[in-house]
Amino acid sequence: MLHNQQVIVKVVNKEPASPAGFFIYCDLLSRYFPLKQLMRQTFIARRIFFIFLIHFRDEYMSPQNNHLQRPPAAVLYADELAKLKQNDNAPCPPGWQLSLPAARAFILGDSAQNISRKVVISPSAVERMLVTLATGRGLMLVGEPGTAKSLLSELLATAISGDAGLTIQGGASTTEDQIKYGWNYALLINHGPSTEALVPAPLYQGMRDGKIVRFEEITRTPLEVQDCLLGMLSDRVMTVPELTGEASQLYAREGFNIIATANTRDRGVNEMSAALKRRFDVETVFPIMDFAQELELVASASARLLAHSGIPHKVPDAVLELLVRTFRDLRANGEKKTSMDTLTAIMSTAEAVNVAHAVGVRAWILANRAGEPADLVDCIAGTIVKDNEEDRARLRRYFEQRVATHKEAHWQAYYQARHRLP
C-alpha cells in the first residue's frame, strides 16, 4: 500500500504538459487503486483538481474557445450599458437598472454618448413600450415573423433588468412547471416539500429577484398554461400550495414584469383568453418599410455575422441590393399584390440577413472570393422555396418577368444565374 501511494504521489507531482497528459495520469492512477479508493485519498484528489484547473483553464477558458454563437445583449453591449448607467442622472422606475431616457438611448442609440442603434423601429413605439412596463402593465409584441420582436424584448429586458436570461419558450409541449416551478424529486421524496427541494422556473425567479421575464411565442402555448399567468399579472403573487407558512406565497419584487411575443401567423392556434389579453398592452411591430433602412440593416448585420464566422469579405453592396429588392418584391407588406406575386414563405428582414450571411460564407469557403449574384441564387432558393411547389413556380416567374427587365450589370448577372434554381 505504501509503495502504491509513493507511486501515485510521484505521478501527480509531475505536472502534465497538456490536457491529454492529464488523462494519462488518471489512467495510471486507476491501475493502482479502484476509483472509490483513489478518491478517498484527499491529498491526491486535491492535486488532481489543481492540475485540472491549471491545465484546462487556458485551453477551455481562453477567448478563442469561449466564443458564443450568439452572445446575449447584456454581454454584447456591456460597455454601453455601463456607460449609460454611469451617465444616467434621471430617476429610475422602481426596480429598474436604467431610467426611461437611458433605456430609450440603449435601444435607439445616442450619437452623443456613442451608443449604437440596435433595432429599426419608430421611437414613439419604443417610448410607449417603456411607459407600459414602467406602469407595471404586461407588454405583448405582435407582428409578422422576423420583425425583431424577440430582439426587441431582449433589449427591453436588458435595459430594465440588466439581463434577459429569464426566458420561456412557448410551444405545444410547454408545461406549467417549466414556467413557474418544479421539484428536485430526490429531495422531495427524502425530505418532503421544502424551499430546498423547489426548482425555480423563469417566472418564479423573475418575481423573486424583481426582473423582466420574456415569454416567447405565447400563443403557441396551451390555453391552460397561458392562464397560469393571470394571478402573477394581476395580484403579483404566486401561490405554492405544496409549501406552508410564508413560503407558500411568493410576492413579486419591484422590477418584475412580463414581455410576451406572438406571431400574427399563429393567430387561432391557441387564442388567448379575454382575461389574459386585458392584462397586456399590445404593441404591433411592423416590417421595415423603407428600402434604404432595410438595406443598411442587412448590410451591417450580415457583416457582423461574417466577421464572427471568420470570413474576411463582406457581401458586396450590389448583391445585397439584389437580395433586399427580391425579398421586398416577393413579400406581402400590405401592398397591392396578387397571390401570383407574393410567396407563402416568410420573407422577413431576419431571413434576408441569414441569406446574406450564407452568400458570404459560400463564396469565401468554396471559391475564395466575395459573394456574387450566382451565389445569391444558390442561397436564396432554400429560404424562399422550401417545399412549396407553387412558390418555386412564382420564383421562376419573378426572374422571367421582373429580374429580366433590369438592365444593370448585376441584375443581368442575377438573371443569367437563374438556371441554378432548383
Positions of predicted regions on the chain:
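Low-complexity, intrinsically disordered or signal/transmembrane-proximal segments
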Residues: 3-6, 25, 32, 37, ...
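Positively charged N-terminal leader segments that act as targeting/secretion signals
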Residues: 11-24, 38-48
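Accessory N-terminal regulatory regions that flank AAA+/P-loop NTPase motors
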Residues: 43, 49-52, 62-89, 407-422
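AAA+ P-loop NTPase catalytic core and its hallmark functional loops
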Residues: 62-309
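Conserved AAA+ ATPase small/helical "lid" subdomain
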Residues: 302-370
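C-terminal engagement/docking regions of AAA+ P-loop ATPases
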Residues: 364-422
